[in-house]
Amino acid sequence: HINRRPWWDTGKQSSKGDDASAGGGKCGEYNDCKKDDRGGSGGGGESQNKKIIDSLKGYKCAQDILKQMPNLNNDLARLLKDTFDTNDKVNITFKAKEGMGSVDGIKSFTEYKNGVFNTTIDLNADVLKYATQEYILVTMYHEFIHAYLSYQVSTLPYDQYTAKFPKVSEYEVKDSNGNIIKKYALIKDHKNYGSFIESLKNSIISFNPVITSSYAEALAKNGIIKRITENKSKINKNERDTRNNEYKGKKCP
């Protein structure tokens, strides 16, 4: 089973002040405040003025995609640019990580200290090696939204945060180590339910207009819809690993 974390899952608990809160002293249930291991990107609080940080050395295709992400013609690109690419006090690092199994990406570090927000996204090295460019792109955008939500919960009063973002239902899964992780699914009748999928779908089409709307939607739904159809699951499986030669997107050179 492919696991791209539901993007509204910020790692915060249900009580005020969790997940790198403005007070800077608490961690969410994902232990987001753990020691920063970004390597060449520097330690926590040392990445000021770097904004969107490329720590993907050895994965040129992913590096090229990351360069394009803030400049594509879609809503998420504009949000990424406005949040991280124009503010030297809000920084995001993308880095590759081995041994992530079925997890495509995860927000592994978050810190809000002295008015500076730093966050790190770990991306599955196997996905960066074998997935189509479209799959890598939507995974990066998906995880960016996790980071964006963490930024919002770090800087907004909790009641404003909960009013701004959709209500969700909670469920539990086990990670590759057998640890219980809480995740969240959108309430189906929520009026904004479709807009999140639409934004991710449009980001794929803006990157590759040849991809059909229904195909892009299948990629966008992965990790947003708790249970997707068998056909959509197969599409994601094929795009995640080009070695099966059943993909429709662009293979990395």
State where each predicted segment sits.
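Low-complexity, glycine/serine/proline-rich disordered segments
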Residues: 1-116, 228-253
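Active-site or metal-binding loop neighborhoods of secreted/extracellular toxin and effector enzymes
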Residues: 2-27, 161-253
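Soluble non-cytosolic domains of exported or imported proteins
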Residues: 71, 130-135, 139
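Active-site scaffold of zinc-dependent metalloenzymes
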Residues: 103-134, 150
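Active-site recognition of the HExxH zinc-binding catalytic motif
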Residues: 138-151
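Extracellular C-terminal loop/segment signatures of secreted glycoproteins
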Residues: 156-159
